[in-house]
Regions:
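Rossmann-like NAD(P)(H) cofactor-binding subdomain of soluble oxidoreductases
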Residues: 59, 65-110
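NAD(P)+-binding Rossmann beta1-loop-alpha1 motif at the extreme N-terminus of oxidoreductases
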Residues: 1-54, 64-67
Length: 110
């Protein structure tokens, strides 16, 4: 079974949002953080930290980490926390992966 919430983008904003959602014990959402590369996914799973973008913050055990956009295909909602310039590329990758859930773009700049 896939996540109920997927967050695409493991920069500071995406990591913080994914951690926040995964820590909501009362809601118990299943949250997946989708990253660009297998190497990044492996490192985040192994270290349970994203010190490059969010130093000193542990990733919750409940947070799944994957590099495959198809992991988001079963999500009820997808948050994309990437730069605006990546919007077209990320949306196309998600569509090719079969993602049909509402997509909320969390961009705060270019």
């Amino acid at each position: 079974m896939g996540p109920s919430v997927a967050v695409v983008g493991a920069g500071p904003w995406g990591t913080a949002i994914a951690c926040h959602l995964a820590e909501r014990a009362h809601a118990r959402p299943s949250v997946a953080l989708i990253v660009r590369t297998r190497e990044a996914a492996d490192a985040l799973r192994r270290e349970r930290r994203n010190d490059r973008y969010l130093p000193g913050v542990a990733l919750p055990d409940a947070l799944a980490i994957d590099d495959d956009p198809a992991r988001a295909a079963s999500a009820g909602i997808v948050f994309a926390a990437t730069p605006v310039k990546a919007l077209e590329d990320v949306a196309a990758k998600l569509a090719r992966a079969g993602v049909r859930a509402p997509l909320v773009w969390l961009s705060k700049g270019r």
